[in-house]
């Protein structure tokens, strides 16, 4: 089963499952998990090939959805919040196992393919000589021209003591086209769904609304003012309020 971080105690309210994005980990949503975990249990997962979860030979959305289903079969039906890659995995979970999902929140992603890729970032991480580095500052220098915030985000997945990335970079690189795409899935999710996007992000636009509504007919679209793709890091209070309002509604 996926590595999980549990925040808060089980209560009469449904648990909230939080699913991070590409190159992330369960800890990325820690601030929001702790705040929402005051009155319900929050289950944050490390996705396959990330963090302290198992490595696999494939990184596709049906496999990721099966991983999430295994977690919820253990913890019970839940509200599910997924960001970016985790949002796509959460959508596939809701479409294939609607019995496990009470309410769905998708953060800044749509059920469509995207043209950009993250291969250059993988190459930068692979430039780090793991045998030689003694500090994160040295790793940052080896990665070359990266924004400070991006480098800091990647370094959360660097285990200096074990001299390894907690990311299966080879598989993520090989399956990047699959990660950027969205699989053909039969059926639809008729439960409540909130598609939360950053107003400054280009990941979800009005052109994507038809694709969302075809699979999630009850979807509500909401923007977080002033936020980009990393809306939970940029506007945590606003994201928390939107999530809380939706799951308590």
Residue positions per predicted region:
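Gly/Ala-rich beta-loop-alpha elbow adjacent to hydrolase catalytic centers
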Residues: 82, 86, 90
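Conserved alpha/beta-hydrolase catalytic His-Asp/Glu region
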Residues: 131-185
């Amino acid at each position: 089963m996926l590595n999980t971080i549990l925040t808060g105690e089980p209560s009469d309210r449904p648990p909230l499952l939080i699913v991070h994005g590409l190159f992330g980990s369960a800890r990325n949503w820690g601030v929001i998990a702790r705040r929402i975990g005051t009155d319900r249990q929050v289950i944050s997962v490390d996705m396959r090939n990330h963090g302290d979860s198992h490595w696999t030979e494939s990184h596709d959305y049906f496999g990721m959805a099966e991983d999430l289903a295994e977690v919820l079969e253990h913890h019970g039906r839940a509200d599910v919040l997924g960001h970016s890659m985790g949002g796509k995995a959460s959508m596939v979970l809701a479409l294939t196992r609607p019995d496990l999902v009470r309410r769905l929140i998708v953060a800044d992603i749509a059920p469509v393919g995207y043209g950009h890729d993250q291969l250059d970032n993988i190459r930068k991480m692979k430039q780090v000589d793991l045998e030689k580095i003694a500090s994160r500052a040295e790793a940052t220098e080896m990665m070359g021209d990266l924004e400070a915030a991006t480098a800091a985000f990647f370094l959360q997945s660097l285990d200096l003591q074990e001299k390894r990335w907690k990311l299966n970079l080879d598989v993520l690189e090989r399956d990047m086209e699959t990660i950027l795409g969205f699989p053909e899935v039969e059926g639809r999710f008729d439960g409540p769904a909130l598609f939360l996007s950053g107003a400054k992000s280009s990941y979800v636009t009005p052109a994507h609304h038809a694709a969302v509504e075809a699979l999630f007919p009850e979807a509500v679209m909401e923007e977080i003012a002033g936020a980009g793709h990393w809306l939970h890091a940029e506007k945590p209070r606003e994201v928390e309020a939107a999530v809380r309002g939706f799951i308590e509604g």
